[in-house]
Amino acid sequence: MLAWYRAHRTPELTRVAEALAVIGGVQVLPLITLAIVAGLYRAGARAHALFLALAVGGATLLNVVTKLIFQRPRPDVLEAVLREPGFSFPSGHAMANAAFGIAITLIFWRSRAGWPVAVLGAVWAVLVGVSRNYLGVHYPSDVLAGALSSLVWVVGLYLLMGQFRPSLRGSPAGERDNR
């Protein structure tokens, strides 16, 4: 699969993939997350703010620990567009951005923005994951493991927090889901 991406690289797609790497990386995604957390908190949706912070922060911590356990080397750096430090498995970009996308989907699902946010969250997570393979810095299994780990983490966190903070099941605007 990495060979297919390598064979189909173009300057335009490479610029897009590099932009996704920056926006979804450790310097920008935390700022986006913090801005949304602050907005939710100011709007009185404190359970939602806490959930988003724990979802993305917890996925990041889980990623660091998992990388230290597996210590999988990255794909051949001579074939990669970017040089990334550290281990490959699981993809930190895929994990953090999947956690972000899943969390904002769960937060806004019951609001008017539900479907658009769900679609944007899913598309964003997929694009960041694909970009990691396109850039040659991760194997497909790294990206898949990162996304699936975040799915389990974020949904598990949502179910657990929903038991102790029932307001999390409603929209940030205060509507409640009684299903």
Located regions from the model:
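N-terminal transmembrane-helix/juxtamembrane module of multi-pass inner/ER membrane proteins
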Residues: 1-28, 68-81
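Surface-exposed charged/polar residues within alpha-helices that form helix-capping/stabilizing sites
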Residues: 3, 22, 39-40, 106
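Membrane-interface loops
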Residues: 31-33, 40-115
